[in-house]
């Protein structure tokens, strides 16, 4: 390649905004996990920590703001307010920082200190709510603040159709492209439900035989048993069925115990070199359960790994002697 062509190729890789770095995250085969558990399947992790603010939620943060700007609901002076357990807030904080908007995050006090500090590092204001009230308490506080602050806007990840839509437009097509259509099962945790809904919807549109499996905490089995409860798998298990979850998309729900999610997350770090979060551990544990079923022998399972484990070093998942 000539120097001129090299310069041209290099210029084409320079992005103008952090938001342009979102998406096109890699798939990696969890070969050691497969080997260590004697699994005759291919388990692929979609590693969302490669998004610029470190999680799958960067996708919806950008999408919700972009749609609100198009609709005239957000301008340069708009105060953004969002109830979040963490990752959506971090993604929004990065987008708001780049745009210059003020951002107020309401979140349960039970979320990790890393999540709080990350949002503050991006310049967001964090308002903590009663942990016993879960996400419902954070949502109520966000609505209260929106009523008090003029020119404010709540992206509302739990009700905003841009949430599942961006996964149908990006996450699903990326998986289909990178597997060359060779995907049999999708495994995704349910927080807002946007990932499993949008991604699952796209994959099923390409092949109706693709099985979609939703993952929730065993401590709060809202989808599988109809009741909420306390759990430690941050990012999934909001305690209610969100508007952004289409329950007709998934074929099965697997409930995962806190310790199983912790243990699998630790295993991914120690054996695969993948430092991912608690909900990633839950998704891979569920994938492992599916892999043990005789009918799934030889199949390809894609598990969404939503974020990085660096957000949870202070939690029970990484308590070292």
Locations of regions flagged by a protein language model:
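PLP-dependent amino-acid enzyme catalytic core
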Residues: 2-321
